[in-house]
Structure formats: C-alpha cells, structure tokens
Amino acid sequence: MLAKHSKLFFTGSVVFLIVAIVLASWGFPKIISTRIQKSIQLENSSMMYDKWVKLPIPLIFKVYFFNVTNAEGINEGERPILQEIGPYVYKQYRERTVLGYGPNDTIKYMLKKNFVFDPEASNGLTEDDDVTVINFPYMAALLTIQQMMPSAVAMVNRALEQFFSNLTDPFMRVKVKDLLFDGVFLNCDGDSPALSLVCAKLKADSPPTMRPAEDGVNGYYFSMFSHLNRTETGPYEMVRGTEDVFALGNIVSYKEKKSVSAWGDEYCNRINGSDASIFPPIDENNVPERLYTFEPEICRSLYASLAGKATLFNISTYYYEISSSALASKSANPDNKCYCKKDWSASHDGCLLMGVFNLMPCQGAPAIASLPHFYLASEELLEYFEDGVKPDKEKHNTYVYIDPVTGVVLKGVKRLQFNIELRNMPRVPQLQAVPTGLFPMLWIEEGAVMTPDLQQELRDAHALLSYAQLARWIILAAAIILAIIATITVARSTSLISWPRNSNSVNFIIGPMVNDKMR
C-alpha cells in the first residue's frame, strides 16, 4: 500500500516538474508579456487605443531662429554673423480621426495637429518679437527662375520688388508669429506682367508654405508652419498589431498610396516605419539596428541607429540616435544616391554635400534640410560663417529611448533645420555683392518626455515581469526538491536502497559503524 502511494507521489512530482520546467522556460514570461503586449495593440478595448487617438500630453515644439546681425555687411560681401534666438515654445496637441479598418490588420486615420504658444516655457520671448532672417520665398523664387529661365531673372526681380514690401536686400524683418503661423503678406496687386506671371504660377502650383489671402485681397501669405496647424493630414494606414505585435505602428500607405513619388526610385520612394508616435515592442533576440519613421513633410523615411542600452527613469531601454549615414552624401552612403535631383542647373547632378538634404522634389521650392547648426554635415558648410553656427551633439542630435517590452517612447527628440542658398547674382541689385553659401533660417525641435504617472505605470509592468521571472524559478526549485523527495520515498518503499529497520536517519548513517564496534 505504501509503495502504491509512493509511486503516485512520484508520478505527480514528475508531472509537476515537467509543468514547472515548461512554465519556467516559456510559460510565465510568455503569459505576462502577452498580456502587456495585448494592452498596446490598437483595439478599442486596449489601454493604448484612447491614448493613441488623443495624446494625453502635448508634444513640445520649439523653434530657434538664426537672427542676422550683420545684414549690411553681408550685402557688401562679408561672411554672415548669426545669433540664435529661442526657443519659442509651443504645445503641440495631436488628435486622430479613425476612418476605418483594413483587411490586413490595419487602421486608417487622419492626423490633426494644434500648436499653442507657451509663454512660460519661452522664458520671456514672445510671438511679437522681431527677427531678421533670410528671405526664404524671395530666394526660392529667384533660384527657381534662374534654373528655368536665367535670362528672365532681372525682369522677375523687378516684379518681386512689388511682391515683397521694402525689398532692399535678401533678408526679412518680421514678427515671429507672422513668420511661423499668421503669415507675411505678399502683394499681387499690380500692373506688371512679370508680377502677374509670378502670382499666376503661385495660383497654379503653390508650395504648402503659401496660402491665398482671403476677403478679396489680391495676394498670398507666407508662413513656415500654418499648413500644419489645425489642419488634418492623411489619410495614413497603419498596422494595428493585433496579428503581429512586432509590426505595430508600421505605416503601409499615405494618402492612399503605398509609396511617395518625389524621387523616381523604388528605394527612396518607399514608405517605411511609423509616424513616430508608436513603435512595436523589441524582440530581445532580434533587436533592430535601425528604427524608421516616415516624415511626410520631407517625403521620405528617416532612420535612427541603435547606439546601445541605457537606463532612463530606472527603466532599461534601447537608445537610438540619428547617424551620419542617414543624411550622408552618395559617396559615403550609395543608398542615398536616388535622393539626388537636378534642381539648379543642367550641369549640377543635384547631389549635395554631406549632411544636407534637398526638399525641392517634395515641397516644390529649393529648400535644403539639415540637422541643426549643420551637425553631422560637411565642414565646408561651416566655413561660410563668421560666427553663430556651432554644431553640438548634445543640443542638436535626434534620438529616442524605447522600452523594449511595450515599444513605448520614454523620451524622444526630433530636430530639423531649414536652409536655402543665398546666391550671388550680378544682375540682381539685392544680390550683387553677397557671398554665395547655404544659409539657415531656423531649426525646430519636436519632442516629449514620459510623465511621472506613466513612468510608474511602465515600472509596474516591468515589476510584474520581474515577479514572474522570480516565481518561475521558485516553482522550478520547489518541483525539483519535491521530485527528489519523491524519488527517495519510492526508493525506500521498493527497497532500492537498503534501509535499516527501526532506525532513524541518524542510525541509518552511523548505526552499522557502531554495531561493528560493539561486536
């Protein structure tokens, strides 16, 4: 009877050990991580869904201007001396309108941004401040005309003298709010055939930074970001992650197209990555070397490269930052060759220096993007300036800290600078003596830091995983101990081990030795 019970005990212990091994090696971590990952999938019932539709906290949008301090000297051939003014800080609220769901685990939506000035965070700077910056639309118009019809540059410039008020040099003296959102008025009311041609061109094909005046006024308003404020963009189509959580957030189409058309090349036209608001969890066995985001404002995807692990807010994260290869010249990164476009002259292949990126094919204007202060760009660009342009990794880098368990961004910053060529043109009075070079207007920073409440939620999720890790080893250890006890019990009951009768554990060890001596 004892042997039968011992065998049952042994069998149960072995089964428990097998179950414990399965739970320890796969079950507990998988169960907990699956529960956590299910909460981040874009389903109506998930914890993430409402936060994704309407961000619970605003992003922080900062603007820094390159104020020109020696405009008169530049007009006489001096190298530019610039003064960085900023940040002008805005709260950027984001809200999505869900349009429906696709057959391949996708969700379709429109994205709306709303910018609200934050005077407290701006530390005394106001939107009524005056700045002197490069005249972006003026230079864009002349560069475009010089490319299309060089002989017409002087005539068009006379028209532009009516289009712009007080056009004495290639610089604008404007208020911050007008340059960013309200708009700088450009006049189309005149009898010049060239002016009519310029305004007709704008009416037929105006860049997003230009909007027509209202209430019967004949003209346009130029602003850098008005087209992004309180207007919906899209539709975007994004993977929901309910079938494959590691594909969560990947954009599969934008404006009903699965690729952009700006670059005339399959690789460069590819839509790749997320909209930077949501990322998939990171598979610890297959950590991606690059993290892609799709940027519709520049018609391309950019990537940040894995820099390693980092601890932030007492949470282990993966740290990604933009690398020189992302905006490298074609000689340094042949993959970037397809971003070269002929936009200035027939003799120019459109391939720019290291660290700068041509926006003409995307925006319809000869603007050039870079990282702030030409960080990671060619040293040649810095030689153009007397002072005021000083790249600094800490201030000008783009980076993100990603929680591998949820894919949530703990902290992230995206930075971009807008430039245009200031070109010497002998037939244009305003440009007869200026030095030719790439001139920055402003740079922006868009970022967010996880709030303390959300940090605690994330730490709790990590703690749950840690408890599961601890529990699986405790259960495994208990199962092993139980299996050993069961083995000994079965062995004793079946006399596999010679157990002395009527002896306790101590007698079992020392008894025979004592008995021998007594003999």
Swiss-Prot record:
<feature type="glycosylation site" description="N-linked (GlcNAc...) asparagine">
    <location>
        <position position="166"/>
    </location>
</feature>
<keyword id="KW-1133">Transmembrane helix</keyword>
<dbReference type="GO" id="GO:0007608">
    <property type="term" value="P:sensory perception of smell"/>
</dbReference>
<feature type="glycosylation site" description="N-linked (GlcNAc...) asparagine">
    <location>
        <position position="67"/>
    </location>
</feature>
<feature type="glycosylation site" description="N-linked (GlcNAc...) asparagine">
    <location>
        <position position="229"/>
    </location>
</feature>
<feature type="topological domain" description="Cytoplasmic">
    <location>
        <begin position="491"/>
        <end position="519"/>
    </location>
</feature>
<keyword id="KW-1015">Disulfide bond</keyword>
<keyword id="KW-0325">Glycoprotein</keyword>
<keyword id="KW-1003">Cell membrane</keyword>
<keyword id="KW-0552">Olfaction</keyword>
<feature type="glycosylation site" description="N-linked (GlcNAc...) asparagine">
    <location>
        <position position="272"/>
    </location>
</feature>
<dbReference type="GO" id="GO:0005044">
    <property type="term" value="F:scavenger receptor activity"/>
</dbReference>
<feature type="transmembrane region" description="Helical">
    <location>
        <begin position="8"/>
        <end position="28"/>
    </location>
</feature>
<dbReference type="Pfam" id="PF01130">
    <property type="entry name" value="CD36"/>
</dbReference>
<comment type="function">
    <text>Plays an olfactory role that is not restricted to pheromone sensitivity.</text>
</comment>
<dbReference type="GO" id="GO:0005737">
    <property type="term" value="C:cytoplasm"/>
</dbReference>
<feature type="glycosylation site" description="N-linked (GlcNAc...) asparagine">
    <location>
        <position position="44"/>
    </location>
</feature>
<feature type="transmembrane region" description="Helical">
    <location>
        <begin position="470"/>
        <end position="490"/>
    </location>
</feature>
<feature type="disulfide bond">
    <location>
        <begin position="340"/>
        <end position="351"/>
    </location>
</feature>
<comment type="similarity">
    <text>Belongs to the CD36 family.</text>
</comment>
<feature type="disulfide bond">
    <location>
        <begin position="268"/>
        <end position="338"/>
    </location>
</feature>
<keyword id="KW-0716">Sensory transduction</keyword>
<protein>
    <recommendedName>
        <fullName>Sensory neuron membrane protein 2</fullName>
    </recommendedName>
</protein>
<feature type="glycosylation site" description="N-linked (GlcNAc...) asparagine">
    <location>
        <position position="314"/>
    </location>
</feature>
<keyword id="KW-0675">Receptor</keyword>
<feature type="glycosylation site" description="N-linked (GlcNAc...) asparagine">
    <location>
        <position position="104"/>
    </location>
</feature>
<dbReference type="GO" id="GO:0005886">
    <property type="term" value="C:plasma membrane"/>
</dbReference>
<feature type="disulfide bond">
    <location>
        <begin position="299"/>
        <end position="362"/>
    </location>
</feature>
<keyword id="KW-0812">Transmembrane</keyword>
<keyword id="KW-0472">Membrane</keyword>
<feature type="topological domain" description="Extracellular">
    <location>
        <begin position="29"/>
        <end position="469"/>
    </location>
</feature>
<dbReference type="InterPro" id="IPR002159">
    <property type="entry name" value="CD36_fam"/>
</dbReference>
<feature type="topological domain" description="Cytoplasmic">
    <location>
        <begin position="1"/>
        <end position="7"/>
    </location>
</feature>
